[in-house]
Swiss-Prot record:
Gene: X
Record keywords: Activation of host NF-kappa-B by virus, Activator, Apoptosis, Host cytoplasm, Host G2/M cell cycle arrest by virus, Host mitochondrion, Host nucleus, Host-virus interaction, Modulation of host cell cycle by virus, Transcription, Transcription regulation
Signal sequence region: none
HAMAP family with a match to the protein in the record: HBV_X
Functional description taken from the UniProt entry: Multifunctional protein that plays a role in silencing host antiviral defenses and promoting viral transcription. Does not seem to be essential for HBV infection. May be directly involved in development of cirrhosis and liver cancer (hepatocellular carcinoma). Most of cytosolic activities involve modulation of cytosolic calcium. The effect on apoptosis is controversial depending on the cell types in which the studies have been conducted. May induce apoptosis by localizing in mitochondria and causing loss of mitochondrial membrane potential.
Full protein name: Protein X
Length: 154
């Protein structure tokens, strides 16, 4: 069974909320402002590793009070990239992760809104989830003892 996330837009508060699907009731929703730009480097991961949620295959930053790095990246209102075609988005985000020079575009914002700014639930191999992972998160996954795959870990 794949780790599953439910991402919900709260238009009243202009906040994107990420909730683990099937987590214990003690699991808290993660939310952050959509208007804030992402930091240039990943934030420190808090001591709380999220183990109380009994979920593996999630980046350690998924349990940060600021929310996951990759989703915070894709939820920024203003996106910058090095390409001019939507089908190159995953490659573009990976290049941005490596620190290559970006330039402003207009299509990228609409593309991300179409993928993210709706209620959705993800599990397994899915393009939108891959886009989030390629968005720049450098944190280790929460899993043990063997290496895990973000898309297939239970």
């Amino acid at each position: 069974m794949a780790a599953r996330l439910c991402c919900q837009l709260d238009p009243a508060r202009d906040v994107l909320c990420l909730r683990p699907v099937g987590a214990e009731s003690c699991g808290r929703p993660l939310s952050w402002s959509l208007g804030a730009l992402p930091p240039s480097s990943p934030p420190a991961v808090p001591a709380d590793d999220g183990s109380h949620l009994s979920l593996r295959g999630l980046p350690a930053c998924a349990f940060s009070s600021a929310g996951p790095c990759a989703l915070r990246f894709t939820s920024a209102r203003r996106m910058e990239t090095t390409v001019n075609a939507p089908w190159n988005l995953p490659t573009t985000l990976h290049k941005r992760t490596l620190g290559l020079s970006p330039r402003s575009t207009t299509w990228i914002e609409e593309y991300i809104k179409d993928c993210v700014f709706k209620d959705w639930e993800e599990s397994g191999e899915e393009l939108r989830l891959k886009v989030f992972v390629l968005g720049g998160c450098r944190h280790k996954l929460v899993c043990s003892p063997a290496p895990c795959n973000f898309f297939t870990s239970a």
